[in-house]
Regions:
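N-terminal Sec-pathway targeting helices
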Residues: 1-15
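Substrate-recognition/specificity elements adjacent to catalytic centers across diverse enzyme folds
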Residues: 20-284, 289-295, 313
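Proteins synthesized as precursors that undergo proteolytic processing into mature forms
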Residues: 103, 114-115, 136-137, 413-444, ...
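Glycine- and hydrophobic-rich flexible loops that cap the catalytic core of alpha/beta enzyme folds
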Residues: 250, 263-265, 306-321, 325-330, ...
């Protein structure tokens, strides 16, 4: 997308202004925080107290006015972001950016997020409809006022169209897609075809037997004994489709969407401590979702106050409800549950593609007509196919092989907005658990704490039940094996209330061990963050919000600490005993000023390349390599020799370079690459020298194999709450700021606090809000809704 926007330079020429005048002209587009503003759709006045970080604390007389106000404020601060997400969710990016995003739009249309959103709206019920309509009224009131149009709209010469309730739902499903766990089944199916199932099994993800699970052994007490957690045999069918159809289609179509617009990554930390482990003798809950770091931030903080719904926390612009936060009695946090929620099904079509083969015979293929409007060009009209298994992924070019349909749990309509609203309204553990039962996608690990002293864990979401287990590769649409037989019930999902250990820790690690009778997934995040959090929790017997916030900043990498002796051995063997001594003494802290992180991580990445490139080029799973490093041998090659070779390769570039010189975070704005304009407006936030790494609690991860190791995702928000003092300790913080206007003082004013782990309290008692400005939203005189 960055290349698409270089043409925006013409706008600068049209301004006929100097750089300073340009900044002044654009800066005038930032709306003031105070005053009175009429809002169509309101029935009564709504008071907004702005604190010094630009967080709105909203007081309304009923929920509908509250959500109208949230919609208005979201649009006021983040309308460009909302509009971009809406176009991405609906596969309409080409309306903004022209022909170069047609491939991405075709892929996004295949996800059918608009169809799902329409189905969700049908099941939302009267209250859900009112909530979503109220939010849309607020957004549209801001669009209609016509002032303070974000500079991004000027650059691409576009105006936001009216907001509809289904747009919010489509954005919600876009987030679910970003959090999916597609896993490595397609790559492994291809490996099985080339090298055989036995060899592919050696590359399959494994979770260490001794690594921590979220639900410890002995805590699962279900009386049910059906199903199987065991993997199905590796399948080799139909790998031609996997390799040539899906992979290349993904790279050419979904790939651009993923790089430019996706905001989410499957990782986070959340933990809750019981009363016996805290200084206040009340639970303390902590959460930091690890998502793509971008500008503006994914999240928007609010204090939401109306009778029956008083919640503080993080919202997503475009979605009307608090997603993560707490009320006066209870709170919750999320991490991705890593559920295996997407399967691919190879379909056998008739010669004219009008029918497809099923286990019960031939069925008629559904044909979906699509029209993509293209800025500066003629519309693209085409047809795509759908089967009972899901939408059929389009082939790339003239590649051979059977077509693949995609089965995804989020294709079934569910009411997450209603569930989140009910969670915010809950007053105790039973009412919260009842509300959570409606939350189905994306699947989440949910940690819970309340003022009554309870702590709990729940796996929330749809977990498919597969006929015959879960294999690798694509299932065959004409066979029963691998097909879905519904979902686990709420009673069958893992849960844990007031565990004996008096804490719950989740870091995308395995949910539960072999005692659990149902299949959830085979792919979990490696256990290092969970192990380190457990170390810190067990060392802190009288925790406070200060000590918990400090734990969120921890930069000890358990994995790098474990492999440092191996790196030291390799360094000594290559003639650098001085480096070997330093590595043996290193504690695993990924500090910007230390050189050991640079050397160890560079060595590990080079070793990963050497180990895999001879057998599975382009597919380098971490889990098997970590297992082989722990055992000291690989089934594929001479691991010791490769360790020495990797060290010899990286020493010249990595031996004495501080981690901070190669590891930085830039929170990028989509328009930052536009020459001159990006620099004038300082769209990006960064580069920031950031401690931590891929496996630290304070994550600063990169998915690049080559140095320098730029960090691309990390803590997108931090939240800590002590239920002994919800308004006096803990708080929230974002990595950028509240505003989407680059020249606003609130565009990047939280960054320093985020780096230092300094949280910002959002009081539930409005009398304790330290407001710096007051905005009153009033009905516009047209009678409200």
């Amino acid at each position: 997308m960055k290349r698409l926007l270089r043409g925006a330079l013409g706008l600068i020429a049209l301004l006929g202004a100097t750089g300073g005048a340009t900044r002044l002209w654009l800066g005038a587009e930032v709306p003031p925080l105070g005053g009175r503003e009429p809002v169509a759709g309101l029935r009564d006045s709504v008071v907004v107290l702005w604190d010094s970080l630009g967080v709105p604390h909203i007081a309304a007389r009923d929920e509908e006015d509250l959500f109208t106000a949230i919609g208005y404020l979201h649009a006021r601060d983040r309308m460009w972001e909302m509009d971009l997400l809406r176009h991405a969710a609906l596969g309409r990016l080409s309306e903004l950016f022209g022909a170069r995003t047609v491939g991405a739009d075709r892929a996004l249309r295949t996800l059918e997020l608009g169809r799902i959103a329409a189905a969700q709206l049908e099941i939302a019920g009267p209250e859900g409809h009112r909530l979503l309509e109220a939010y849309a009224h607020g957004v549209n009131a801001w669009i209609a006022q016509g002032r303070y149009r974000a500079v991004e709209f000027r650059i691409i010469r576009h105006a936001a169209e009216p907001w509809r309730p289904e747009h919010s739902l489509a954005i919600g499903r876009l987030e679910a897609w970003d959090l999916r766990t597609t896993g490595d089944e397609l790559e492994l199916g291809d490996v099985a075809a080339r090298l055989g199932p036995a060899r592919a099994a050696q590359l399959a993800p494994t979770y260490p037997d001794t690594a921590p699970t979220i639900v410890p052994p002995g805590e699962w007490r279900s009386g049910r004994g059906v199903g199987a957690e065991h993997d199905a045999p590796l399948s080799s069918a139909p790998t031609l489709a996997v390799r040539t159809v899906f992979r290349r289609a993904y790279a050419s179509a979904w790939g651009p969407y993923e790089r430019e617009f996706a905001g989410f990554a499957p990782a986070s930390n959340a933990w809750v401590l019981g009363p016996s482990r805290t200084a206040s003798h009340k639970p303390i809950l902590a959460n930091d979702p690890h998502l793509t770091l971008r500008a503006p931030s994914i999240w928007y903080l609010v204090g939401a106050h109306a009778p029956g719904y008083e919640v503080v926390g993080a919202t997503i612009p475009g979605i009307p409800i608090v997603v993560l936060g707490h009320n006066a009695r209870l709170g919750w946090g999320f991490t991705n549950a890593m559920v295996d929620d997407v399967d691919y099904v190879a379909e056998q079509l008739s010669p004219d593609s009008t029918r497809y083969r099923t286990p019960d015979g031939w069925a008629r293929t559904e044909v979906v007509a699509e029209t993509i409007l293209v800025h500066g060009s003629t519309p693209l009209v085409y047809r795509r196919l759908r089967t009972a298994d899901g939408p059929v992924i389009e082939r790339a070019g003239h590649e051979a092989g059977p077509p693949l349909a995609m089965r995804w749990v989020a294709h079934d309509p569910t009411d997450e907005i209603g569930a989140l609203r009910a969670m915010g309204r809950a007053t105790d553990l039973p009412s919260f658990e009842a509300a959570l039962a409606g939350f189905r996608s994306p699947e989440q690990n949910v940690v819970y704490g309340d003022a009554a002293g309870n702590i709990a864990y729940f796996l929330a979401g749809h977990v498919p039940v597969r006929h015959g287990g879960a294999g690798f590769g694509a299932a065959s649409g004409w066979a029963k094996a691998g097909r879905w037989d519904g979902y686990l019930t709420a009673a069958e999902l893992p849960r844990m209330v007031n565990p004996a250990q008096a804490y719950v820790v989740t870091a995308n690690n395995r949910v539960i061990g072999d005692e659990y009778p149902f299949y959830i997934s085979r792919e979990w995040e490696l256990p290092y963050r969970a192990q380190r959090i457990l170390e810190l929790v067990r060392q802190d017997s009288a925790a406070t919000t200060t000590s918990v916030a400090r734990a969120q900043l921890d930069i000890v990498d358990v994995f790098c600490r474990a492999i440092a002796p191996l790196a030291a051995r390799a360094a000594a063997a290559t003639g650098r005993p001085d480096l070997a001594a330093g590595l043996r003494a290193w504690d695993g802290a990924m500090s910007p000023e230390r050189a050991e992180p640079t050397l160890v991580w560079s060595w590990y990445r080079e070793l990963q390349r050497l180990v895999y490139d001879s057998v599975s080029p382009g597919y380098r799973p971490a889990e098997p390599l970590h297992h082989w490093l722990a055992r000291g041998r690989s089934p594929w090659n001479d691991l010791s020799a490769l360790e020495r070779r990797a060290m010899a390769t990286v020493l010249p570039r990595a031996a004495e370079r501080p981690w901070g010189s190669v590891h930085a975070t830039v929170q990028e704005h989509p328009l930052s690459a536009v020459p001159l304009l990006g620099r004038l407006l300082r769209f990006n936030v960064g580069p920031l020298v950031t401690p931590g790494g891929n496996y630290t609690v304070n994550v600063a991860s990169t998915d690049e194999f080559a140095a320098p190791f730029a960090s691309t995702w990390g803590p997108s928000m931090r939240h800590v709450v002590d239920f002994g003092d919800v308004d006096g300790a803990g708080g929230f913080i974002l990595p950028t700021g509240q505003s989407g206007y680059p020249l606003s003082p609130h565009y990047r004013d939280e960054t320093t606090r985020w780096l230092k782990g300094q949280l910002w309290i959002l009081p539930l008692d409005l009398q304790r809000v330290r407001s710096v400005s007051r905005l009153v939203l009033v009905p516009d005189g047209r009678g409200g809704r």
